[in-house]
Each structure stands twice: as C-alpha cells, then as structure tokens.
Amino acid sequence: MPIITDVYAREVLDSRGNPTVEVEVLTESGAFGRALVPSGASTGEHEAVELRDGDKSRYLGKGVTKAVENVNEMIAPEIVEGEFSVLDQVSIDKMMIQLDGTHNKGKLGANAILGVSIAVARAAADLLGQPLYKYLGGFNGKQLPVPMMNIVNGGSHSDAPIAFQEFMILPVGAESFKESLRWGAEIFHNLKSILSERGLETAVGDEGGFAPRFEGTEDAVETIIKAIEKAGYKPGEDVFLGFDCASSEFYENGVYDYTKFEGEHGAKRSAAEQVDYLEELIGKYPIITIEDGMDENDWEGWKQLTDRIGDKVQLVGDDLFVTNTEILSKGIEQGIGNSILIKVNQIGTLTETFDAIEMAQKAGYTAVVSHRSGETEDTTIADIAVATNAGQIKTGSLSRTDRIAKYNQLLRIEDELYETAKFEGIKSFYNLDK
C-alpha cells in the first residue's frame, strides 16, 4: 500500500563537514526513500531559507537540529496522521508549503521541506519498482545532459585570487554522455600536469576543481585551452568553455569590484563596463555559457547583457532567478537572460522545481540542473536532469566522490536506457543562434 507510515530526519554531514538534513520515508508496504539536502556557499538573497541553529557551541553555529525537529515534530505528524499516499507528491509538497506559511520557507526551513519532498519521491519510485528518473519523467525522460565541468574554482569557492567563481568545460562534441565524461576527465588530468609543470597548486576547491594562483581570468582561460589541446581536442569545436561569474559576490554600490578577490590588480567596473568586458571575453575565447554575469538585482545590467550577447552565449540566471517561477516569469517577460539554473534547495520542493523547469522550457529558455558547493552522496539531480530532458547538468569537476556520484549515476542511467538514450551535445543549447 502507498500510505506513508513513517517520516524521520537526522543531522548528517555534507562535503564541507557542515551539518545537513537527511530524511527517510517509509510506507506501510515497506517502500523506502532517503534524501540528503545540499547547501550553497554563495547564495542568492531571494533563495528559500536554509534553517541553521545559530548555536556557536555546536558546529560553529551551523547545526540543523531545528530543521530536523521541524521534520520529526511538525511535518511527519501531518503526513502520517493525514494518511498521505507516497504517490501524491504535489499534495504533500503543497501541504508543507502551507504548513510553513511564509514566502521563503523561513519557518520550517527549505532544508527540512526539501528533504521530505525528495524522500517521498524516492519512496514512490521504490514502491513502483522504478528508477527515480523514470518515476519523475515517465517514458519521455531519455536525454542525457551535457556536463558543465568546473575544473578551475575561484571566487567564494576557493582561495585563488580570481573573482569569477567557476571556469567550466563543456564537451559538446561527444556522441554520448559516457564519451563526454571521458573527454572531461582527460582534460582535467592534462590540466593537472600543466599546473604541476608551472609550479602551481593542484589542490582542489569545494567542487573538485583546481584553485591555483593564476595571474588573472585570462591566464586561467588560456591554461584550460592548453589542457583541452593537450588532451587532443579542439576548443570551440569539441569542447567549449563556460563561466560562473557569481557577480553578486563582488558587486557593491553599483560597482563590480574585482579587487574583493583579486586585490590591487583587480578592476572596478560599472555595469556598462562589465557588459563590455564579458563581450570582449566571448570574442576572444570559445565561451558558450555565462552564469550570473551581472548582479542579481542589476536587472538593467542584465537587460544590456542579454541584448548585447544573448543570441551568441547562454546567459544563465542563478542568483537572478533562484529557481523561482514568480521571478523567472518577470525575467521572461522583460527578456532577461535566456537560461535558468535549477537548484532544488533554492526553492525547496520537487513540485516547484519541476514548475520552474517547465516554465523555462516553454519560453525557449534552457534549464541547467545544478548541484551546490556543499554536496552529499545523494544523486537526485542526475535523475532530475534526465527526467526533465534538461539537456545540461552542472555538478562539479572530475574529483571528489560527492561530485563523481552524480556522473556515475548518469552513466548507469545511460546504460539502462541503452538505444533510447539521447545525447544532444551542441543542440542542447537551443536558445542560441548556432
């Protein structure tokens, strides 16, 4: 039977050694689902609230016992006593949103609500004897995503003196996900050898990318291009580049202040100058995607950027849209960006996550399913990417098990789909004039 009989949460650790929420759901027939909730370092101010204890005597204030208690003492009784079916995802998500009663899930915590939401879906898939991607996407979920591999970390994700947070490679010329993953791994290892030859650090950041002390953005880009070529691939044909600028991290009082991360050598740019700079970079290098090129509240700057280069480059809104349909609809109406980053914990339920993906795709925007910098062994986002035919996934570099777990899950899914599996490569960027 599909009736949920038990919902239980506990405090566990994420990839940074910080507490996070794990939730387990059990049905009367024995179907079981478990979910672990991720956490971000650079967060948009409009994201749903991640509830932390604030008790400095435990985990430096980052404990999540309040969120755990909210699951065990508030959400669980509502679900169990309400005799909810594990198959009724939308009703359960709606009930939790109403139980919270705030616009940003600040009462119960998005980390509490999301843990339950995903665990319910996993238990439902278990009940039906289906893999999660098939339960979520039906027979139509069959497109494997192009991986955005973050092989150099900067900004808030490392101690490297570079303002941009992520430098990514996208193996769009591969014929399968399996091949794209191999290309990425080969480039990653070639990059490591190049860094070693230069006497640069090969320690990795939060998302598994290297965090060396490059001389600046262009030094990082040119070194990555050398690694692509050394691995035997053609930049701008086989493999493209991408940035996550995370501009909100260095934007203040109308100025994009690169000195925050780059010191005295960093520039200070107005919105117009920031647009000019990004346009200059895409003219010089094979860049296909730029995330958060402007501050989340600089909508005028975003409009300038979109009008200027939105037909040539994917412009992804992360802090801008925060997986929120209300904000995304305004962006679509005003012609802001052409893509949305999808982070399940930015909004807090699977139902709202799928609503955001559907809205984006109907408007001709792409949807990039994404991890967070604080991750776990949970692989749900891999299944979401395939279930929704998102076509793109951003889940870190080619190191750290918390990142590799998602790639390995996608390999399993591709094998299971066999001849029905699709990998669209460059066609996944349907928002661009190619």
Swiss-Prot record:
Required cofactor names: Mg(2+)
Enzyme class: lyase
PROSITE patterns registered for this protein in UniProt: ENOLASE (PS00164)
EC numbers for this chain: 4.2.1.11
Domain of life: Bacteria
NCBIfam families named in the record: eno
PANTHER family assigned to the protein according to its UniProt record, in alphabetical order: ENOLASE
Stated name of the protein: Enolase
